[in-house]
């Protein structure tokens, strides 16, 4: 009986048949050819980004504009973004430690005090807010200015905080009292960058603005010690056709020479003790977004929107070489006391370079949108990046 059943033909009724459509037929019905489908698949594969990060933080709901690493407890990272929030989080575990609230607009600046005890946030709502880390990030106070905050800078040896505003004013407070020490006026345009100089000493405060003016202040008195403006055409960051301002700068260890980057691509080198222009460097054609001086070698790196990083000899002021990138370079920083430079690019990639040879040593990927900010741990082993994709990623930059 079993043998008969085996030999019987299998009969399937017509109403039991399901039509099987081949993938190719379906694609044709949808108006997509095999070649187009294959190309779409290849494009998808090409757009997949390898995530090389060792940790990350994903609580922000909008672009991350600023990031800072605690100088004493280097596992602590502070970040601020377009969601009006700041966060304190651990770069080793990715865990949130504290949410910093109270701003009514984007946080565009965030910075730790020199001893790591305070964290300050600056927002487009004209507020500077302050928290104390040693008391569980207890909120201390809020400082009101008259316009959007552009940058923050702590004094490298004391509890003094400076802030630059969109209206051209510069504010300085003493902590922990919160007393306003100085309000400095002299700029007539947004103050794009400012910091205490020289590095690690902070005897003076240098600021640059969107109209092409540099002012070096005495922070104790609030008086300007050096003022250079585009009224002197030799100092003008623009040209006859286009007005321009200063967008970035860095200072030498002695505190007497500044390298200034302009929105037209020009770099000026000035002695602020004598107010003399030492050089005009014009290897780039678009805005210089960041300038970094190497502490291990006489090298100055200038990152530009034109997709290059220009390297100059900071002693002879001669052009050395250009480091090419795929898109605009947003930031550049040297690993501490090394000839190794990290660059953050709008193509979502962090790159590591040896500035002695110009050799590309590594690329670190993981972001899906342009990188807007980065911070390096004090030991130079890791870099934290913030992006338009709302994420913060941690990369091991030793390898």
UniProtKB/Swiss-Prot annotation:
Main location: cytoplasm
Record CDD domains: WD40
Pfam families according to UniProt: WD40 (PF00400)
Protein's name according to its UniProt entry: Uncharacterized WD repeat-containing protein C25H1.08c
Localization per Swiss-Prot or TrEMBL: Cytoplasm; Nucleus
A Gene Ontology cellular-component term: preribosome, large subunit precursor
Species this chain originates from: Schizosaccharomyces pombe (strain 972 / ATCC 24843)
InterPro entries: WD40/YVTN_repeat-like_dom_sf (IPR015943), WD40_repeat_dom_sf (IPR036322), WD40_rpt (IPR001680), WD_repeat_multifunction (IPR051179)
UniProt key word Cytoplasm: yes
WD repeats: 59-99, 102-141, 144-185, 187-227, 241-280, 283-322, 324-363, 366-399
BP GO annotations: cytosolic large ribosomal subunit assembly
Keywords: Cytoplasm, Nucleus, Repeat, WD repeat
Gene3D superfamilies: YVTN repeat-like/Quinoprotein amine dehydrogenase
Alphabetical list of PROSITE patterns matching this protein: WD_REPEATS_2 (PS50082), WD_REPEATS_REGION (PS50294)
Native organism taxonomy: Eukaryota, Fungi, Dikarya, Ascomycota, Taphrinomycotina
């Amino acid at each position: 009986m079993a043998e008969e059943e085996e030999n019987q033909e299998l009969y399937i009724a017509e109403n039991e048949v399901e039509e099987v459509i081949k993938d190719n037929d379906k694609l044709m019905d949808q108006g997509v050819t095999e070649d187009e489908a294959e190309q779409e698949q290849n494009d998808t594969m090409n757009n997949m980004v390898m995530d090389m990060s060792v940790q990350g933080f994903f609580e922000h709901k909008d672009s991350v504009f600023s990031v800072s690493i605690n100088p004493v407890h280097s596992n602590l990272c502070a970040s601020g973004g377009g969601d009006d929030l700041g966060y304190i989080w651990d770069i080793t575990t990715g865990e949130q430690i504290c949410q910093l609230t109270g701003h009514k607009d984007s946080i565009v600046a965030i910075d730790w005090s020199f001893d790591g005890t305070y964290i300050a946030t600056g927002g487009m709502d004209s507020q500077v807010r302050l928290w104390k880390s040693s008391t569980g990030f207890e909120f201390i106070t809020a400082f009101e200015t008259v316009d959007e905050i552009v940058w923050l800078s702590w004094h490298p040896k004391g509890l003094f905080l400076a802030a630059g505003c969109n209206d051209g004013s510069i504010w300085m407070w003493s902590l922990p009292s919160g007393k306003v020490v100085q309000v400095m006026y002299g700029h007539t345009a947004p103050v794009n960058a400012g910091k205490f100089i020289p590095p690690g000493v902070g005897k003076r405060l240098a600021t640059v603005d969107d109209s092409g003016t540099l002012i070096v202040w005495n922070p104790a008195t609030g008086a300007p010690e050096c003022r250079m403006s585009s009224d002197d055409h030799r100092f003008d960051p623009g040209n006859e056709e286009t007005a321009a301002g200063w967008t970035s700068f860095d200072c030498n260890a002695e505190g007497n020479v500044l390298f200034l980057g302009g929105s037209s691509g020009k770099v000026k080198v000035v002695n602020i003790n004598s107010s003399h222009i030492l050089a005009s460097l014009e290897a780039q054609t678009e805005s210089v977004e960041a300038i970094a001086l190497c502490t291990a070698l006489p090298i100055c790196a200038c990152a530009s929107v034109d997709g290059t990083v220009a390297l100059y000899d900071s002693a002879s002021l001669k052009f050395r070489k250009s480091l090419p990138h795929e898109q605009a370079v947003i930031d550049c920083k040297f690993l501490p006391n090394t000839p190794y430079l990290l660059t953050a690019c709008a193509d979502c990639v962090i790159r590591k370079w040896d500035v002695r040879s110009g050799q590309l040593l590594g690329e670190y990927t993981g972001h899906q949108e342009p990188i807007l900010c980065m911070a390096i741990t004090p030991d130079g082993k890791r870099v934290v990046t913030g992006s338009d994709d709302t994420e913060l990623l941690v990369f091991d930059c030793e390898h």
